[in-house]
């Protein structure tokens, strides 16, 4: 039994390391899998794609790179891209160097005598920016100038881009992105844990070698528990949120027995494991502060979409290979209608906010209470209203949440104690973060005085702890309890509508990011020599016919031999070819 676990872990670790070869986990046929269609095959896509500048040229990673490549071939536009890059660097510059970096940008791009002067930013706006720089430089100094540049680029340059070979290449990438996703898209590895409707296992995309976690939701288990709306809600929320601090959904597909969510893999274990199983319970304040800041950024991204998470607790915060965290398991998250409040007594005992326990209407406030619980537990080594391994009834824990004050030990600095008390204020209207400014108000608390959130959000700060790359931070394979077989539930065609809403294939932004991170984009995104069209982009150059398989070539040779002696062999030959074609397709999709 121990051998089975060792083998499963060894295979997983080898996959995480890229298989040890030059392909870094990619299939031998990865270029064939990601072969561009001929541009003539993309005409339907060209007609139907939403031609929105922000989506095509900024939000979508592959689109952003291709628009940049287009601009770099136009002498008048190259400086605009360089300006945007310089501002992005400015925004993550340490505070003490902002003035120096700001002056550099002003001189290079916003001074008329400069060879790369940005002509489309108005003189009044330049003067206002210069005045703010002299008074006190801030991260948002060039925001209005950036908006002005984008306003210009979304005009004539964008329309020229839509007629260029770079947009044609984007259509080819979109065509690949929209290809069907099945279980054969992935290699499957060991079980990592279990969710409410099925197991979670590690998997790897054959074409790119990228590792993910596959959350399997068993169809019969969903139907038996009437969990369709909950499963679809989680999928749609994951699809909507693109944050480096929340697990991302990359693919959604179905098999005969399950619906599958393919998510960011987090190999470093959860916060509960690290709080209680790595030496003395709890963290040094510096480490707790770093995780709290990243959790706060994740909440901010969710709240930006008007989504309240409602289940903050250590086991739902996962670490990646580098020690950064992400919020996971969005099963209880819900989107709040604009200008409305919701009601729902959901969450985990000891972490639910007073307004949730009292079944009152609320907005985003429960998440700031949950953040307070997490900061307290990371520092103290136990949750604020329940001792470690304390056996106590749910009603008693709820009473403590509603009526008692948390106790602070010597482990808390004054700033840490202050932020916890302000986040654990029982009246939601008085709670830190629950005013109009939301997360921005929490970021200004003295606890985060030395945290550069711009650099944190850009992934430029080193975590205080890095997980061991040779360790598998999950239970042994045989210790993960298996689900029992679901009996008395039959699947039929009435379930198909739900399955079709769920199984939508690749999610654009994560899929495109995967192509870039695994260097597939760099290797495949090749044009003709000296900026000319590659054959697959040449409309007058017909696409190559598909290569015939061995059986087809043999049948053709047989037909040629038979045709010399039999005038009626044509029908027989067509029958052979059609039979072989069906057989070949069946094999390819298995």
From Swiss-Prot:
Expression by tissue: Highest levels in lung, heart, retina, lingual epithelium. Very little in brain, liver, kidney.
Region (Disordered): 554-590
Domain Protein kinase stretches: 186-448
UniProt GO cellular component terms: cytoplasm; nucleus; plasma membrane
Annotated segments matching region Interaction with calmodulin: 20-39
Compartments where located: Cytoplasm; Nucleus; Cell membrane
Binding, ATP: 192-200, 215
Active site: 311 (proton acceptor)
Membrane topology: Peripheral membrane protein
Catalytic activity field: [G-protein-coupled receptor] + ATP = [G-protein-coupled receptor]-phosphate + ADP + H(+)
Motif mapping: Nuclear localization signal: 388-395
Residue spans of biased composition, Low complexity class: 561-590
Chain positions found as Phosphothreonine: 485
Record comment: activity regulation: Inhibited by calmodulin with an IC(50) of 50 nM. Calmodulin inhibits GRK5 association with receptor and phospholipid.
AGC-kinase C-terminal domain span: 449-514
RGS domain location: 53-171
Keyword match Chaperone: no
Domain of life: Eukaryota
Cited SUPFAM superfamilies: Protein kinase-like (PK-like), Regulator of G-protein signaling, RGS
GO biological process: apoptotic process; negative regulation of apoptotic process; protein autophosphorylation; regulation of signal transduction; Wnt signaling pathway
UniProt-listed Pfam families: Pkinase (PF00069), RGS (PF00615)
Region (Sufficient for membrane localization): 546-565
EC number: 2.7.11.16
Subunit organization: Interacts with ST13 (via the C-terminus 303-319 AA). Interacts with TP53/p53. Interacts with HTR4 (via C-terminus 330-346 AA); this interaction is promoted by 5-HT (serotonin). Interacts with HDAC5. Interacts with GIT1.
Biological function: Serine/threonine kinase that phosphorylates preferentially the activated forms of a variety of G-protein-coupled receptors (GPCRs). Such receptor phosphorylation initiates beta-arrestin-mediated receptor desensitization, internalization, and signaling events leading to their down-regulation. Phosphorylates a variety of GPCRs, including adrenergic receptors (Beta-2 adrenergic receptor), muscarinic acetylcholine receptors (more specifically Gi-coupled M2/M4 subtypes), dopamine receptors and opioid receptors.
Protein name, UniProt field: G protein-coupled receptor kinase 5
Name of the gene this protein is made from: GRK5
């Amino acid at each position: 039994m121990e051998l089975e676990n060792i083998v499963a872990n060894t295979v997983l670790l080898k996959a995480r390391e890229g298989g040890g070869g030059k392909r870094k986990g990619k299939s031998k046929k990865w270029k064939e899998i990601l072969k561009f269609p001929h541009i003539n095959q993309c005409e339907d896509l060209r007609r139907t794609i939403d031609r929105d500048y922000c989506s095509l040229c900024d939000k979508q990673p592959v689109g952003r790179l291709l628009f940049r490549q287009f601009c770099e071939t136009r002498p008048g536009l190259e400086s605009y891209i360089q300006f945007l890059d310089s501002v992005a660097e400015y925004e993550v510059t340490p505070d003490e160097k902002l003035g120096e970096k700001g002056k550099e940008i002003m001189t290079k791009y916003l001074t008329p005598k400069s060879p790369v002067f940005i002509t489309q930013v108005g003189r009044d706006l330049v003067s206002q920016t210069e005045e703010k720089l002299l008074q006190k430089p801030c991260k948002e100094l060039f925001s209005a100038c950036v908006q002005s540049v984008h306003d210009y680029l979304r005009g004539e340059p964008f329309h020229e881009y839509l007629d260029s070979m770079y947009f044609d290449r984007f259509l080819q990438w979109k065509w690949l992105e929209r290809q069907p996703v099945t279980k054969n898209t992935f290699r499957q590895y060991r079980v990592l844990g279990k969710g409410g409707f099925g197991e979670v296992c590690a998997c790897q995309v054959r074409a790119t070698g990228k590792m993910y976690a596959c959350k399997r939701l068993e169809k019969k288990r969903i139907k038996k528990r009437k969990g369709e709306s909950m499963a679809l809600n989680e999928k749609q929320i994951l699809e909507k949120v693109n944050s480096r601090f929340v697990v991302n959904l990359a693919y959604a597909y179905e098999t005969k027995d399950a619906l599958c969510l393919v998510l960011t893999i987090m190999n470093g274990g959860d916060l509960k494991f690290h709080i209680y199983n790595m030496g003395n319970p709890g963290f040094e304040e510096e480490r707790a502060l770093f995780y709290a800041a990243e959790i706060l950024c994740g909440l901010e991204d969710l709240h930006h979409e008007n989504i309240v998470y409602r289940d903050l607790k250590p086991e739902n915060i996962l670490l990646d290979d580098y020690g950064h965290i992400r919020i996971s398991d969005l099963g209880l998250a819900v989107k709040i209608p604009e200008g409305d409040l919701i009601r729902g007594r959901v969450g985990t005992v000891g972490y639910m906010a007073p307004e949730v326990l009292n079944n009152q209407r609320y907005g985003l406030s429960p998440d700031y209470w949950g953040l307070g619980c997490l900061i307290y537990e990371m520092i103290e080594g136990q949750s604020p209203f329940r001792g470690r391994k304390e056996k106590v009834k749910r009603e008693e824990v709820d009473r403590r949440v509603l009526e008692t004050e948390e106790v602070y030990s010597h482990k808390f600095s004054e700033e840490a104690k202050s932020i916890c008390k302000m986040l654990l204020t029982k009246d939601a209207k008085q709670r830190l973060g629950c005013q109009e400014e939301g997360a921005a108000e929490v970021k200004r608390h003295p606890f985060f005085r030395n945290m550069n959130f711009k650099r944190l959000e850009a992934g430029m700060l080193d975590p205080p702890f890095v997980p061991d790359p040779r360790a598998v931070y999950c239970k042994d394979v045989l210790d993960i309890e298996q689900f029992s077989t679901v009996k008395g539930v039959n699947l039929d065609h009435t379930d198909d509508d739900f399955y079709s809403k769920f199984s939508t294939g690749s999610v654009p932004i994560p899929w495109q990011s995967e192509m870039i991170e695994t260097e597939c984009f760099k290797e495949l995104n090749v044009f003709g020599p000296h900026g000319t069209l590659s054959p697959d982009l040449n409309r007058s150059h017909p696409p190559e016919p598909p290569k015939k398989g061995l059986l087809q070539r043999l049948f053709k040779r047989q037909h040629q031999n038979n045709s010399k002696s039999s005038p009626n062999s044509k029908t027989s030959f067509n029958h052979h070819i059609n039979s072989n074609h069906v057989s070949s397709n069946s094999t390819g999709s298995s």
